[in-house]
Amino acid sequence: MSTPKPDRRTFVKWGIASAGVPLVADALGALAEAKAEPPAAATDVSDGGERGGSTVSLGSGVQLYYKEDWLGAPWLNGEPAILLHGNLETHEIWYGWVPRMAQQFRVLRPDLPGFGRSTAPRDFEWSLGNYAKLVANFLDAIGIASAHIIGAKTGGAIAMQFAATYPQRTRALVVASGPFTSVAPGTDDNSQQVRLGSAATKEEMAYFDKLRDETSAETRRGVGTMMSNFNLESLLPRIGAPTLVITSDRSKLQSVDTVLRYQPKIPHSRLLVVTSDAYHVAVANANECVTNVLAFIRETKQA
């Protein structure tokens, strides 16, 4: 039986198009029912236009900067959601997600080590496994046992590595344009028009150019080498959390057919294909992504 082509509103489950089919019940095996943890003490940071940022020490010289947002009732504390950005950028790329996500979740957006205001470990061995370990260390540092893990681009690959390595710490997984295998060296040096799509404004592209230019040469080399030499295929069956994979129908990072070769290997996964010529869908199609992510997580909790 041939695999049907999904449209922008179609979820694909195990490679078979199925619009809105609930996740199977055992998909919730890795979704721990736990109370939201209170935030741990951290150092407040006030710098530039950012307010309310904090840093935590992860050892080995790592000072990790992160932003935390909760816009729900002040007497409540939402379930934690960790948002992991991609290469050549910072936590700021999630600006389109915070207003709605933070009404329902305690949203934590770290600058991954080596990016933004976070330092990389001394003598860091650049690998997805080491980045996943640093994310786990971050959760430990702020007192979080498990969280919804959401990643974009390189952050999506790190998120998959984390979910496979720490299944009991992953409530749900969202991968927005995250590659499953090596990408060509220099892929993230593509023009912002390619990354953000034809609808991107000059001001938006200039801003992302600024984030790229502010990334250190050491980080660019390290992450570039890491992303041109990895393969997550053998780890995908180990991901136990309900998973939503998001891509675009005209992505220049990886085609829908390429995604369909790997996404079904994640046991409890769905694929959402949005109509876009950008491959950074977390930014270019933020509103549609958030709408579907909120619905997806809500469904997994109700199943």
Predicted regions and their residues:
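N-terminal secretory signal peptides and thylakoid transit peptides that target proteins
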Residues: 2-19
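C-terminal segment of N-terminal export signals and the immediately downstream linker at the start
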Residues: 5, 26-59
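Conserved HGGG/HGGXW glycine-rich cap/lid loop of the alpha/beta-hydrolase fold
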Residues: 62, 69-117
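Active-site loop/oxyanion-hole signature of alpha/beta-hydrolase fold enzymes
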Residues: 67-70, 109-150
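Conserved hydrolase catalytic core segment
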Residues: 145-183
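Hydrophobic, aromatic-rich cap/lid helix
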Residues: 207-234, 250
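Short beta-strand/loop motif that positions the catalytic acidic residue
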Residues: 239, 245-247
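Catalytic active-site module of serine/aspartate enzymes centered on a nucleophile-bearing elbow/loop
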Residues: 275-303
